[in-house]
Amino acid sequence: IKTNKFNHLINDKLKGFDKKLSLKTNDIFLKLKLNNNSININIDNPKIYSGSEFIDLSKIDINLDLIKFIKNDNSIKNIQIISKENPIKTLTNFINSYKFNASRFVIFNQIESGNIQAKTNIYFDEENQNDFTYEVTGKVNNAKLNTLNETFVSNINFNFDIKNQIFNFDNINLRYDNIDFQSKKIRISKSGKNFEVKGDLSNKKGLIKPNTFSK
């Protein structure tokens, strides 16, 4: 079923999370699944806004509990958000507009170029919709960084999986100081106030300057 009935519901949920956020949608499709008492809402090609900054999305799928929806209770089971391939600068501008952080702003300013695509799954607690878990997977292509000492890291490509404060990166390739580096996998996990990093790093044959990792 094609409908616009849920436009306000979705935007109200977003604004309940943060008033800065809004969603621009075209057509919304509704699928009723009586076999498991659920409603699926499918939104194609929406845009999510924070002020004037926005991210292009490929689709949003929302799974609702039918009975709870009829009773006007907490009805959202899970949400899947799939983005289009966006410039990384578009994403960082969106994040800065949504919630500015000076330290993060300095880091973001080091990003010269590159593209990112991601899929986010959000699973809501049945009793309290303010409690949820999430998983973000995706890939970064052809990114380039300009570090504070004017040294460039280029040709950055990797896949990522973020879940429960654990960051997994795989198939990593990058070029630094005219040397190509690769990593099969790097895992970063939070341990108290610190982060623990595990993984591998290798390089193709090339001359490594003594100060490459101490600049």
Q: What positions do the PLM features span?
A:
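Extended amphipathic, helix-rich lipid-handling scaffolds
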Residues: I10, L14-G16, L21, I79-D131, ...
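Repetitive beta-strand solenoid architecture
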Residues: N42-D44, D56, S75, Y134, ...
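Outer-membrane beta-barrel translocator domains and adjoining extracellular loop/strand segments
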Residues: N149-T151
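Transmembrane beta-barrel architecture of outer membranes
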Residues: V153-N157, S183
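Short, exposed beta-strand/loop patches in secreted or surface proteins that constitute
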Residues: L30-L32, F158-F160, I186-I188
